[in-house]
């Protein structure tokens, strides 16, 4: 056996966890219940307290017990997975908004690096393009907001909270820019929530999702959809190492585009 193989074996043995005791398994089960309790779509007055309690209970576990955490939605990855540096993400939940605001509404992601780069990138771009407006953030997935709050202590507003913040800060002109792909359930719920608050502002505008308005039928394709389709194909061809769609076709390449889907017709 080589010296390198010996080192690998020793390192593996050093990181092998001791079996969890019955007491540790019971503690892990309680943490699983606490995670499941905050894995919900509705916010309540107890949400922040429950998130804090779940994290404190996780931190108190031994490594062996953490490996035993499970539940309907709970797993060791809920708190244990490294998704990047949360301090690089700006939750944009500050007050002192001013009279003009762009509220960027996203489904959200609990992956810190992706959130800062992708969602944060859109928010930063809008802030540069519209310097007369304050840009703020809201997510539509309370499950994700709870995950971020519990694991990292970062508070992100849901839509209701963001609209209340805008009202409290005296915003008069509100533009809501969703990052949703299409007019699905999340977009419909956003419209419903916004309708309840329209009277709180002098001017309110809701932008369309990326793929634009729904046509009368599947044959109606608007300019937004055409542009997105063109850009997707260009990106796929480039990522595949081809100079053009024609070249890819000549070499027998096929590209498959997979979407999340929606029950909306």
Question: Where are the regions a protein language model picked out?
Answer:
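Active-site-proximal alpha-helix that buttresses catalytic centers in soluble enzyme cores
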Residues: 4, 17, 73-265
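Beta-rich interaction/scaffold domains
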Residues: 4-7, 13-80
